[in-house]
Design a protein with these regions (language model features):
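A short acidic/basic microdomain associated with nuclease active sites
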Residues: 1-9
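Conserved catalytic cores of phosphodiester-cleaving nucleases, focusing on short active-site segments
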Residues: 14-44, 57
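Surface segments flanking catalytic/ligand-binding clefts of nucleic-acid enzymes
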Residues: 19, 64, 109-112
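Structural beta-sheet core signal
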Residues: 26, 69-71, 107
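Short glycine-enriched, charge-decorated loop/helix-capping segments at active-site entrances
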Residues: 40-46, 83-86
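Histidine-anchored nucleotide/phosphate-binding helix
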Residues: 52-62
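Glycine-rich phosphate/pyrophosphate-binding loops
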Residues: 63-76
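Domain-level recognition of nuclease-like catalytic cores that cleave nucleotide substrates
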Residues: 74-127
């Protein structure tokens, strides 16, 4: 089994490339810090690079690779994560399209200390 950081696919560099047996996957990790009334939104500012990554993940999924967009929520006990359509509509559109084409979209909240970040629990993603 392989976990390789900073892996290239197409014209993008993803956070991770993973292999387990016959399975191969690319994963992109996004840190989430914008919270509104118990719900988190991403991105907090327009991100053309983020849209590019999502589209490249979709291309990977369409070729049969596993593709994952992983939101790491740096706030405890939030209710959901959603695309911030008000700030960057193209990101939300790309995310929904990618999810419809096989990209897995996951979110987890975590405990953050000065020395560590510990994944805690899965959080619903509202597309």
């Amino acid at each position: 089994d392989i976990i390789r950081p900073e892996a290239f696919y197409g014209e993008s560099r993803f956070d991770f490339y993973l292999e387990a047996g016959e399975k191969r996957a690319f994963a992109e990790v996004k840190g989430v810090t914008l919270e509104r009334e118990g719900h988190c939104l991403f991105p907090d500012a327009p991100t053309e690079r983020g849209v590019k990554h999502i589209r490249e993940l979709q291309r990977a999924a369409e070729t049969g690779l596993d593709a994952v967009l992983f939101f790491v929520v740096q706030i405890r006990d939030i209710h959901s994560v959603a695309p911030n359509d008000a700030t960057h509509p193209a990101f939300g559109e790309a995310l929904r399209e990618a999810a419809a084409h096989g990209v897995r979209v996951l979110a987890y909240d975590c405990d953050v200390t000065p020395d560590s970040l510990k994944i805690r629990r899965e959080v619903p993603v509202i597309l």
